[in-house]
Protein backbone atom coordinates (compact mmCIF):
# COMPACT_ATOMS: atom_id res chain seq x y z
CA UNK A 1 0.00 0.00 0.00
CA UNK A 2 2.93 2.29 0.65
CA UNK A 3 4.04 1.94 -2.94
CA UNK A 4 0.62 2.93 -4.28
CA UNK A 5 0.38 5.80 -1.83
CA UNK A 6 3.79 7.15 -2.76
CA UNK A 7 2.96 6.94 -6.46
CA UNK A 8 -0.28 8.81 -5.89
CA UNK A 9 1.46 11.52 -3.90
CA UNK A 10 4.13 11.89 -6.55
CA UNK A 11 1.37 12.30 -9.11
CA UNK A 12 -0.11 15.00 -6.87
CA UNK A 13 3.29 16.70 -6.78
CA UNK A 14 3.38 16.72 -10.56
CA UNK A 15 -0.19 18.03 -10.80
CA UNK A 16 0.46 20.76 -8.25
CA UNK A 17 3.57 21.77 -10.13
CA UNK A 18 1.73 21.80 -13.46
CA UNK A 19 -1.09 23.83 -11.95
CA UNK A 20 1.12 26.57 -10.58
CA UNK A 21 3.03 26.68 -13.86
CA UNK A 22 -0.24 27.06 -15.73
CA UNK A 23 -1.73 29.69 -13.46
CA UNK A 24 1.38 31.78 -12.99
CA UNK A 25 1.45 35.32 -14.23
CA UNK A 26 3.63 35.80 -17.27
CA UNK A 27 5.51 38.96 -17.93
CA UNK A 28 6.60 39.01 -21.52
CA UNK A 29 7.12 42.47 -22.96
CA UNK A 30 8.00 42.57 -26.65
CA UNK A 31 8.05 45.91 -28.38
CA UNK A 32 8.77 46.41 -32.06
CA UNK A 33 8.95 50.02 -33.25
CA UNK A 34 8.96 50.44 -37.01
CA UNK A 35 9.28 53.66 -38.92
CA UNK A 36 10.00 54.70 -42.48
CA UNK A 37 10.35 58.45 -43.00
CA UNK A 38 10.89 60.38 -46.26
CA UNK A 39 11.47 64.11 -45.92
CA UNK A 40 12.06 66.04 -49.18
CA UNK A 41 12.04 69.83 -49.04
CA UNK A 42 12.89 72.69 -51.39
CA UNK A 43 13.92 70.58 -54.38
CA UNK A 44 13.83 72.24 -57.79
CA UNK A 45 13.37 69.37 -60.17
CA UNK A 46 12.02 65.85 -60.29
CA UNK A 47 12.12 63.54 -57.28
CA UNK A 48 11.95 59.81 -58.08
CA UNK A 49 11.99 57.12 -55.40
CA UNK A 50 11.70 53.70 -56.96
CA UNK A 51 11.86 50.09 -55.79
CA UNK A 52 11.75 50.84 -52.10
CA UNK A 53 11.39 47.71 -50.03
CA UNK A 54 10.82 47.72 -46.29
CA UNK A 55 10.68 44.20 -44.92
CA UNK A 56 10.53 43.15 -41.32
CA UNK A 57 10.30 39.65 -39.92
CA UNK A 58 9.71 39.25 -36.20
CA UNK A 59 9.86 35.69 -34.90
CA UNK A 60 8.91 35.08 -31.29
CA UNK A 61 9.32 31.66 -29.70
CA UNK A 62 6.23 31.33 -27.53
CA UNK A 63 8.05 28.92 -25.25
CA UNK A 64 9.71 31.94 -23.71
CA UNK A 65 6.33 32.90 -22.26
CA UNK A 66 6.79 30.04 -19.81
CA UNK A 67 9.96 31.75 -18.64
CA UNK A 68 8.43 34.30 -16.32
CA UNK A 69 7.14 34.00 -12.81
CA UNK A 70 6.43 37.63 -12.24
CA UNK A 71 5.32 37.59 -8.62
CA UNK A 72 7.01 36.37 -5.48
CA UNK A 73 3.67 34.93 -4.33
CA UNK A 74 3.66 32.55 -7.29
CA UNK A 75 7.10 31.27 -6.28
CA UNK A 76 6.02 30.83 -2.67
CA UNK A 77 2.90 28.98 -3.75
CA UNK A 78 4.97 26.65 -5.89
CA UNK A 79 7.40 25.80 -3.08
CA UNK A 80 4.59 25.34 -0.53
CA UNK A 81 2.78 22.91 -2.82
CA UNK A 82 5.92 20.91 -3.46
CA UNK A 83 6.86 20.80 0.23
CA UNK A 84 3.38 19.65 1.29
CA UNK A 85 3.29 16.89 -1.28
CA UNK A 86 6.85 15.88 -0.41
CA UNK A 87 5.74 15.18 3.16
CA UNK A 88 2.90 13.05 1.84
CA UNK A 89 5.29 11.15 -0.43
CA UNK A 90 7.66 10.41 2.44
CA UNK A 91 4.81 9.26 4.69
CA UNK A 92 3.83 6.72 2.04
CA UNK A 93 7.15 4.89 2.45
CA UNK A 94 8.54 3.11 5.47
CA UNK A 95 11.58 4.10 7.50
CA UNK A 96 13.90 1.95 5.40
CA UNK A 97 13.29 4.29 2.49
CA UNK A 98 13.06 7.54 4.42
CA UNK A 99 16.63 8.74 3.89
CA UNK A 100 16.59 8.03 0.18
CA UNK A 101 13.22 9.65 -0.44
CA UNK A 102 14.10 12.63 1.75
CA UNK A 103 17.22 13.24 -0.32
CA UNK A 104 15.26 13.06 -3.54
CA UNK A 105 12.54 15.33 -2.19
CA UNK A 106 15.24 17.84 -1.23
CA UNK A 107 16.67 17.59 -4.76
CA UNK A 108 13.19 18.04 -6.20
CA UNK A 109 12.54 21.16 -4.14
CA UNK A 110 16.00 22.51 -5.02
CA UNK A 111 15.34 21.97 -8.72
CA UNK A 112 11.96 23.70 -8.44
CA UNK A 113 13.44 26.63 -6.55
CA UNK A 114 16.17 26.93 -9.14
CA UNK A 115 13.59 26.78 -11.90
CA UNK A 116 11.40 29.43 -10.35
CA UNK A 117 14.46 31.63 -9.83
CA UNK A 118 15.57 31.25 -13.43
CA UNK A 119 12.06 31.83 -14.73
CA UNK A 120 11.58 34.87 -12.56
CA UNK A 121 13.52 36.90 -15.12
CA UNK A 122 11.16 38.60 -17.52
CA UNK A 123 11.73 37.99 -21.19
CA UNK A 124 11.79 41.49 -22.58
CA UNK A 125 12.81 42.28 -26.10
CA UNK A 126 12.72 45.49 -28.03
CA UNK A 127 13.30 45.87 -31.74
CA UNK A 128 13.55 49.34 -33.25
CA UNK A 129 13.77 49.71 -37.03
CA UNK A 130 14.11 53.09 -38.74
CA UNK A 131 14.56 54.05 -42.36
CA UNK A 132 14.83 57.75 -43.10
CA UNK A 133 15.41 59.87 -46.21
CA UNK A 134 16.00 63.59 -45.84
CA UNK A 135 16.65 65.58 -49.02
CA UNK A 136 16.87 69.33 -48.50
CA UNK A 137 17.63 72.25 -50.83
CA UNK A 138 19.01 70.26 -53.73
CA UNK A 139 18.79 71.83 -57.14
CA UNK A 140 18.42 69.06 -59.64
CA UNK A 141 16.91 65.63 -59.95
CA UNK A 142 16.84 63.30 -56.93
CA UNK A 143 16.55 59.63 -57.77
CA UNK A 144 16.47 56.92 -55.10
CA UNK A 145 16.36 53.58 -56.91
CA UNK A 146 16.20 50.00 -55.65
CA UNK A 147 16.28 50.83 -51.98
CA UNK A 148 15.97 47.75 -49.78
CA UNK A 149 15.73 47.58 -46.02
CA UNK A 150 15.56 44.04 -44.75
CA UNK A 151 15.85 43.09 -41.12
CA UNK A 152 15.22 39.77 -39.45
CA UNK A 153 14.70 39.82 -35.73
CA UNK A 154 14.63 36.46 -33.98
CA UNK A 155 13.58 36.88 -30.40
CA UNK A 156 14.43 33.66 -28.62
CA UNK A 157 15.47 34.10 -25.03
CA UNK A 158 17.85 31.58 -23.54
CA UNK A 159 15.65 31.52 -20.45
CA UNK A 160 13.31 29.09 -22.21
CA UNK A 161 16.18 26.64 -22.47
CA UNK A 162 17.03 27.19 -18.81
CA UNK A 163 13.46 26.36 -17.85
CA UNK A 164 13.41 23.19 -19.93
CA UNK A 165 16.72 22.02 -18.48
CA UNK A 166 15.49 22.41 -14.91
CA UNK A 167 12.16 20.90 -15.83
CA UNK A 168 13.99 17.79 -17.06
CA UNK A 169 15.76 17.60 -13.71
CA UNK A 170 12.51 17.87 -11.77
CA UNK A 171 10.81 15.29 -14.01
CA UNK A 172 13.72 12.84 -13.60
CA UNK A 173 13.61 13.14 -9.82
CA UNK A 174 9.84 12.64 -9.72
CA UNK A 175 10.29 9.55 -11.91
CA UNK A 176 12.91 8.17 -9.55
CA UNK A 177 10.68 8.68 -6.50
CA UNK A 178 7.89 6.87 -8.32
CA UNK A 179 10.18 3.98 -9.24
CA UNK A 180 11.40 3.67 -5.68
CA UNK A 181 7.77 3.72 -4.56
CA UNK A 182 7.02 0.79 -6.85
CA UNK A 183 9.80 -1.19 -5.21
CA UNK A 184 9.01 -0.01 -1.68
CA UNK A 185 10.77 -1.79 1.15
CA UNK A 186 8.35 -3.26 3.65
CA UNK A 187 8.36 -5.39 6.78
CA UNK A 188 6.54 -8.68 7.25
CA UNK A 189 3.58 -9.11 4.95
CA UNK A 190 0.17 -9.21 6.74
CA UNK A 191 -0.35 -12.74 5.40
CA UNK A 192 2.87 -13.85 7.05
CA UNK A 193 1.85 -12.27 10.32
CA UNK A 194 -1.45 -14.16 10.20
CA UNK A 195 0.38 -17.46 9.64
CA UNK A 196 2.69 -16.84 12.61
CA UNK A 197 -0.21 -15.80 14.86
CA UNK A 198 -2.12 -18.95 13.92
CA UNK A 199 0.91 -21.09 14.76
CA UNK A 200 1.21 -19.44 18.18
CA UNK A 201 -2.52 -19.69 18.91
CA UNK A 202 -2.63 -23.35 17.95
CA UNK A 203 0.69 -24.26 19.53
CA UNK A 204 -0.09 -22.88 23.00
CA UNK A 205 -3.18 -25.06 23.65
CA UNK A 206 -1.31 -28.05 22.25
CA UNK A 207 1.48 -27.53 24.73
CA UNK A 208 -1.00 -27.33 27.60
CA UNK A 209 -2.62 -30.62 26.59
CA UNK A 210 0.58 -32.51 25.89
CA UNK A 211 -0.16 -35.49 28.14
CA UNK A 212 -3.91 -35.37 27.82
CA UNK A 213 -4.49 -35.83 24.09
CA UNK A 214 -1.46 -37.09 22.21
CA UNK A 215 -3.56 -38.81 19.59
CA UNK A 216 -5.38 -35.57 18.72
CA UNK A 217 -2.55 -33.12 19.27
CA UNK A 218 0.15 -35.03 17.40
CA UNK A 219 -1.61 -35.22 14.03
CA UNK A 220 -2.79 -31.64 14.40
CA UNK A 221 0.76 -30.41 14.97
CA UNK A 222 1.99 -32.50 12.07
CA UNK A 223 -0.74 -31.04 9.86
CA UNK A 224 0.26 -27.52 10.84
CA UNK A 225 3.85 -28.34 9.94
CA UNK A 226 2.81 -29.75 6.59
CA UNK A 227 0.62 -26.74 5.82
CA UNK A 228 3.37 -24.29 6.73
CA UNK A 229 5.98 -26.22 4.76
CA UNK A 230 3.65 -26.43 1.79
CA UNK A 231 3.00 -22.70 1.94
CA UNK A 232 6.75 -22.06 1.85
CA UNK A 233 7.35 -24.57 -0.94
CA UNK A 234 4.52 -23.27 -3.12
CA UNK A 235 5.50 -19.64 -2.62
CA UNK A 236 2.44 -18.55 -0.66
CA UNK A 237 4.60 -16.89 1.99
CA UNK A 238 5.48 -13.45 0.58
CA UNK A 239 9.09 -12.35 0.11
CA UNK A 240 8.93 -8.53 0.13
CA UNK A 241 11.48 -6.60 -1.90
CA UNK A 242 13.97 -4.37 -0.09
CA UNK A 243 16.31 -1.75 -1.52
CA UNK A 244 19.79 -1.25 -0.13
CA UNK A 245 20.66 1.81 -2.21
CA UNK A 246 23.93 2.23 -4.07
CA UNK A 247 26.28 -0.72 -4.23
CA UNK A 248 29.47 -1.51 -6.07
CA UNK A 249 29.42 -4.19 -8.74
CA UNK A 250 28.94 -7.78 -7.52
CA UNK A 251 31.92 -10.11 -7.63
CA UNK A 252 30.98 -12.24 -10.61
CA UNK A 253 34.02 -14.47 -10.06
CA UNK A 254 32.34 -15.76 -6.89
CA UNK A 255 28.71 -15.77 -7.99
CA UNK A 256 27.51 -15.93 -11.58
CA UNK A 257 24.17 -14.20 -12.29
CA UNK A 258 21.21 -16.39 -13.11
CA UNK A 259 20.34 -13.92 -15.89
CA UNK A 260 21.54 -10.61 -17.32
CA UNK A 261 19.04 -8.37 -19.10
CA UNK A 262 19.76 -5.13 -20.97
CA UNK A 263 17.59 -2.05 -21.26
CA UNK A 264 15.21 -2.61 -18.32
CA UNK A 265 13.98 0.36 -16.34
CA UNK A 266 14.30 0.09 -12.58
CA UNK A 267 10.57 -0.57 -12.23
CA UNK A 268 10.61 -3.32 -14.86
CA UNK A 269 13.67 -4.96 -13.30
CA UNK A 270 12.09 -5.06 -9.84
CA UNK A 271 8.86 -6.46 -11.31
CA UNK A 272 10.87 -9.23 -12.98
CA UNK A 273 12.62 -9.98 -9.69
CA UNK A 274 9.28 -10.25 -7.89
CA UNK A 275 7.66 -12.50 -10.48
CA UNK A 276 10.54 -14.98 -10.87
CA UNK A 277 10.95 -17.56 -8.10
CA UNK A 278 14.44 -18.48 -9.30
CA UNK A 279 15.77 -14.96 -8.62
CA UNK A 280 16.84 -13.90 -5.16
CA UNK A 281 18.40 -10.49 -5.76
CA UNK A 282 18.96 -7.79 -8.37
CA UNK A 283 21.84 -5.46 -9.14
CA UNK A 284 20.50 -2.69 -11.41
CA UNK A 285 23.38 -0.89 -13.10
CA UNK A 286 22.92 2.46 -14.82
CA UNK A 287 26.43 3.89 -14.46
CA UNK A 288 29.94 2.61 -14.94
CA UNK A 289 31.94 3.76 -11.92
CA UNK A 290 35.71 4.08 -11.71
CA UNK A 291 37.31 5.93 -8.85
CA UNK A 292 35.27 9.06 -8.22
CA UNK A 293 33.79 9.38 -11.71
CA UNK A 294 30.71 7.72 -13.21
CA UNK A 295 29.63 7.49 -16.83
CA UNK A 296 26.05 6.67 -17.75
CA UNK A 297 25.60 3.49 -19.75
CA UNK A 298 23.82 3.59 -23.08
CA UNK A 299 21.69 0.67 -21.84
CA UNK A 300 20.97 -0.36 -18.29
CA UNK A 301 22.16 -3.77 -17.09
CA UNK A 302 20.06 -5.89 -14.72
CA UNK A 303 21.96 -8.72 -13.03
CA UNK A 304 19.68 -11.26 -11.33
CA UNK A 305 21.22 -13.40 -8.60
CA UNK A 306 20.01 -16.99 -8.16
CA UNK A 307 17.63 -17.80 -5.32
CA UNK A 308 20.45 -19.19 -3.17
CA UNK A 309 22.73 -16.21 -3.65
CA UNK A 310 25.52 -15.28 -1.25
CA UNK A 311 24.94 -11.72 0.04
CA UNK A 312 28.64 -11.37 0.88
CA UNK A 313 29.64 -11.76 -2.77
CA UNK A 314 26.64 -10.03 -4.33
CA UNK A 315 26.05 -6.99 -2.15
CA UNK A 316 29.36 -5.34 -3.02
CA UNK A 317 31.31 -3.04 -0.76
CA UNK A 318 30.27 0.38 -2.04
CA UNK A 319 29.33 3.30 0.17
CA UNK A 320 25.65 3.95 0.83
CA UNK A 321 26.11 7.54 -0.39
CA UNK A 322 27.94 7.58 -3.74
CA UNK A 323 31.07 9.75 -3.55
CA UNK A 324 31.40 10.06 -7.31
CA UNK A 325 30.28 12.71 -9.78
CA UNK A 326 28.94 12.24 -13.27
CA UNK A 327 30.74 12.81 -16.55
CA UNK A 328 28.45 14.98 -18.73
CA UNK A 329 27.01 14.13 -22.11
CA UNK A 330 28.99 15.04 -25.21
CA UNK A 331 27.57 16.68 -28.35
CA UNK A 332 29.14 17.92 -31.55
CA UNK A 333 28.39 19.81 -34.73
CA UNK A 334 29.55 22.65 -36.94
CA UNK A 335 29.15 26.22 -35.76
CA UNK A 336 27.57 27.44 -32.57
CA UNK A 337 25.52 24.87 -30.62
CA UNK A 338 21.87 24.89 -31.54
CA UNK A 339 18.87 23.60 -29.65
CA UNK A 340 19.40 19.97 -30.75
CA UNK A 341 23.06 19.27 -31.58
CA UNK A 342 24.16 15.79 -32.63
CA UNK A 343 25.40 13.38 -29.97
CA UNK A 344 29.11 12.58 -29.90
CA UNK A 345 30.43 9.14 -30.79
CA UNK A 346 29.78 6.60 -28.08
CA UNK A 347 27.13 8.72 -26.41
CA UNK A 348 23.41 8.21 -26.92
CA UNK A 349 21.94 11.67 -26.61
CA UNK A 350 18.50 11.98 -24.97
CA UNK A 351 15.50 12.98 -27.04
CA UNK A 352 15.14 16.19 -25.05
CA UNK A 353 18.62 17.35 -26.10
CA UNK A 354 21.50 18.56 -23.93
CA UNK A 355 21.11 19.02 -20.19
CA UNK A 356 22.80 21.53 -17.97
CA UNK A 357 26.46 20.58 -17.68
CA UNK A 358 26.70 18.83 -21.06
CA UNK A 359 29.49 19.77 -23.48
CA UNK A 360 29.50 20.61 -27.20
CA UNK A 361 32.37 20.62 -29.73
CA UNK A 362 32.35 23.01 -32.69
CA UNK A 363 34.11 20.93 -35.33
CA UNK A 364 34.88 23.96 -37.50
CA UNK A 365 36.93 25.76 -34.87
CA UNK A 366 37.88 23.06 -32.34
CA UNK A 367 36.26 25.09 -29.56
CA UNK A 368 34.11 23.35 -26.98
CA UNK A 369 31.29 24.73 -24.86
CA UNK A 370 29.53 23.75 -21.63
CA UNK A 371 25.83 24.39 -21.07
CA UNK A 372 25.07 26.42 -17.96
CA UNK A 373 22.50 29.18 -18.00
CA UNK A 374 23.63 29.38 -21.63
CA UNK A 375 26.37 27.83 -23.75
CA UNK A 376 29.77 29.13 -22.67
CA UNK A 377 33.08 28.38 -24.37
CA UNK A 378 35.54 26.58 -22.10
CA UNK A 379 38.50 26.13 -24.42
CA UNK A 380 39.85 24.97 -27.78
CA UNK A 381 41.31 21.60 -28.71
CA UNK A 382 45.04 22.07 -29.29
CA UNK A 383 46.35 21.57 -32.80
CA UNK A 384 43.15 22.42 -34.66
CA UNK A 385 43.70 23.03 -38.36
CA UNK A 386 41.47 25.26 -40.45
CA UNK A 387 39.58 23.29 -43.05
CA UNK A 388 39.76 20.05 -41.07
CA UNK A 389 36.70 19.13 -39.02
CA UNK A 390 37.19 17.94 -35.46
CA UNK A 391 35.06 15.18 -33.95
CA UNK A 392 35.07 13.73 -30.47
CA UNK A 393 33.62 10.87 -28.45
CA UNK A 394 34.24 8.25 -25.77
CA UNK A 395 34.87 5.26 -28.07
CA UNK A 396 38.24 3.95 -29.24
CA UNK A 397 38.60 5.07 -32.88
CA UNK A 398 40.38 1.82 -33.78
CA UNK A 399 37.39 -0.30 -32.75
CA UNK A 400 34.57 1.31 -34.74
CA UNK A 401 33.82 1.87 -38.40
CA UNK A 402 31.64 4.89 -37.65
CA UNK A 403 34.67 7.21 -37.82
CA UNK A 404 36.06 6.15 -41.19
CA UNK A 405 34.91 9.41 -42.78
CA UNK A 406 36.68 11.52 -40.18
CA UNK A 407 40.25 12.75 -40.23
CA UNK A 408 40.77 14.26 -36.79
CA UNK A 409 39.17 12.69 -33.73
CA UNK A 410 39.49 13.57 -30.05
CA UNK A 411 39.19 10.46 -27.94
CA UNK A 412 37.83 11.56 -24.57
CA UNK A 413 38.54 9.39 -21.55
CA UNK A 414 35.61 10.20 -19.25
CA UNK A 415 37.40 8.79 -16.22
CA UNK A 416 40.57 10.86 -16.70
CA UNK A 417 39.84 14.15 -18.38
CA UNK A 418 43.46 15.23 -18.66
CA UNK A 419 44.28 12.17 -20.77
CA UNK A 420 42.10 12.96 -23.76
CA UNK A 421 44.08 12.34 -26.94
CA UNK A 422 43.95 13.52 -30.54
CA UNK A 423 44.03 10.91 -33.31
CA UNK A 424 44.60 11.47 -37.05
CA UNK A 425 43.28 9.19 -39.79
CA UNK A 426 46.18 9.44 -42.25
CA UNK A 427 48.80 7.42 -44.05
CA UNK A 428 48.78 4.86 -46.80
CA UNK A 429 46.96 2.72 -46.09
CA UNK A 430 45.04 5.06 -43.86
CA UNK A 431 44.91 4.21 -40.20
CA UNK A 432 44.35 5.94 -36.89
CA UNK A 433 47.52 7.36 -35.35
CA UNK A 434 47.71 8.92 -31.88
CA UNK A 435 49.06 12.48 -31.91
CA UNK A 436 49.03 14.34 -28.60
CA UNK A 437 47.10 14.74 -25.39
CA UNK A 438 44.28 17.25 -25.30
CA UNK A 439 43.45 18.48 -21.79
CA UNK A 440 39.80 19.46 -21.41
CA UNK A 441 38.20 21.89 -18.99
CA UNK A 442 34.81 20.22 -18.51
CA UNK A 443 33.38 20.22 -14.97
CA UNK A 444 31.66 17.12 -13.65
CA UNK A 445 27.99 17.27 -12.71
CA UNK A 446 26.28 16.34 -9.46
CA UNK A 447 25.67 12.80 -8.23
CA UNK A 448 22.64 11.40 -10.08
CA UNK A 449 19.38 10.21 -8.61
CA UNK A 450 19.24 7.11 -10.83
CA UNK A 451 22.47 5.51 -9.67
CA UNK A 452 23.22 1.78 -9.37
CA UNK A 453 20.91 0.00 -6.93
CA UNK A 454 21.06 -3.26 -5.00
CA UNK A 455 17.66 -4.96 -4.45
CA UNK A 456 16.91 -8.29 -2.80
CA UNK A 457 14.02 -10.46 -1.64
CA UNK A 458 13.62 -10.50 2.12
CA UNK A 459 13.43 -14.11 3.38
CA UNK A 460 12.71 -13.21 7.02
CA UNK A 461 9.06 -14.23 6.82
CA UNK A 462 9.87 -17.35 4.81
CA UNK A 463 12.46 -18.47 7.34
CA UNK A 464 10.10 -17.79 10.26
CA UNK A 465 7.30 -19.85 8.74
CA UNK A 466 9.74 -22.53 7.58
CA UNK A 467 11.31 -23.17 10.98
CA UNK A 468 7.99 -22.85 12.79
CA UNK A 469 6.60 -25.48 10.43
CA UNK A 470 9.62 -27.71 11.00
CA UNK A 471 9.20 -27.41 14.77
CA UNK A 472 5.48 -28.10 14.62
CA UNK A 473 6.04 -31.04 12.29
CA UNK A 474 8.73 -32.64 14.46
CA UNK A 475 6.65 -32.16 17.62
CA UNK A 476 3.56 -33.57 15.92
CA UNK A 477 5.45 -36.58 14.60
CA UNK A 478 6.93 -37.29 18.03
CA UNK A 479 3.57 -37.07 19.78
CA UNK A 480 1.87 -39.22 17.15
CA UNK A 481 4.62 -41.84 17.34
CA UNK A 482 4.46 -41.96 21.14
CA UNK A 483 0.69 -42.35 21.02
CA UNK A 484 1.00 -45.27 18.59
CA UNK A 485 3.93 -47.02 20.29
CA UNK A 486 2.72 -46.45 23.84
CA UNK A 487 -1.12 -46.23 23.97
CA UNK A 488 -2.91 -44.89 27.05
CA UNK A 489 -4.15 -48.41 28.10
CA UNK A 490 -0.65 -49.88 28.07
CA UNK A 491 0.67 -46.97 30.02
CA UNK A 492 -2.10 -47.34 32.65
CA UNK A 493 -1.53 -51.08 33.10
CA UNK A 494 2.19 -50.63 33.47
CA UNK A 495 1.75 -47.97 36.10
CA UNK A 496 -1.05 -49.72 38.19
CA UNK A 497 1.15 -52.35 40.13
CA UNK A 498 3.27 -49.69 41.64
CA UNK A 499 0.22 -47.90 42.88
CA UNK A 500 -1.35 -51.08 44.30
CA UNK A 501 1.81 -52.08 46.16
CA UNK A 502 1.83 -48.87 47.99
CA UNK A 503 -1.70 -49.33 49.28
CA UNK A 504 -1.00 -52.32 51.60
CA UNK A 505 1.95 -50.54 53.05
CA UNK A 506 -0.29 -47.71 54.00
CA UNK A 507 -2.87 -50.18 55.31
CA UNK A 508 -0.24 -52.12 57.31
CA UNK A 509 0.47 -49.12 59.30
CA UNK A 510 -3.15 -48.82 60.35
CA UNK A 511 -3.19 -51.77 62.79
CA UNK A 512 -0.13 -50.44 64.50
CA UNK A 513 -1.85 -47.21 65.00
CA UNK A 514 -5.03 -49.03 66.04
CA UNK A 515 -3.16 -51.32 68.48
CA UNK A 516 -1.99 -48.39 70.40
CA UNK A 517 -5.52 -47.23 71.10
CA UNK A 518 -6.53 -50.33 73.20
CA UNK A 519 -3.26 -50.24 75.10
CA UNK A 520 -3.88 -46.63 75.90
CA UNK A 521 -7.35 -47.49 77.16
CA UNK A 522 -6.07 -50.30 79.35
From Swiss-Prot:
The keyword Transmembrane helix applies. It is a multi-pass membrane protein. Keywords: Host membrane, Lipoprotein, Membrane, Myristate, Transmembrane, Transmembrane helix. Disulfide bonds: none annotated. A lipid is attached at residue 2 (N-myristoyl glycine). Residues 503-522 are annotated as: Disordered. GO terms for cellular component: host cell membrane; membrane. The chain crosses the membrane at residues 193-213, 217-237. It is found in: Host membrane. May play a critical role in virion formation. Essential for virus replication in vitro. This is Putative myristoylated protein 053R.
Amino acid sequence: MGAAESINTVNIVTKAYAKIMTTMVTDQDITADQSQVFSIDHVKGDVVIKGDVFTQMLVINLASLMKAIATQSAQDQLIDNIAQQAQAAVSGLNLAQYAYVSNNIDRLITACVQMSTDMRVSCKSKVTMTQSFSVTDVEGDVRVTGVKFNQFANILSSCAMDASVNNDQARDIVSQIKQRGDAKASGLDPTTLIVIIVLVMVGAPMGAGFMAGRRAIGPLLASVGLIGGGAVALGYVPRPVKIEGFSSDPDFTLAQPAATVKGLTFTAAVAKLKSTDGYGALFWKNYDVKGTTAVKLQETLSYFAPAGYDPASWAGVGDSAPPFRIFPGLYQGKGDPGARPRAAYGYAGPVAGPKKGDAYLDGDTGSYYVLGDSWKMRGTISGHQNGRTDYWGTVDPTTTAALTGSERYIWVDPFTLVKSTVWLFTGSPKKWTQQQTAPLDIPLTNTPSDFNVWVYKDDTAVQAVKWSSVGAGVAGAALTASALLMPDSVASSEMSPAVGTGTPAIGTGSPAVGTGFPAHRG
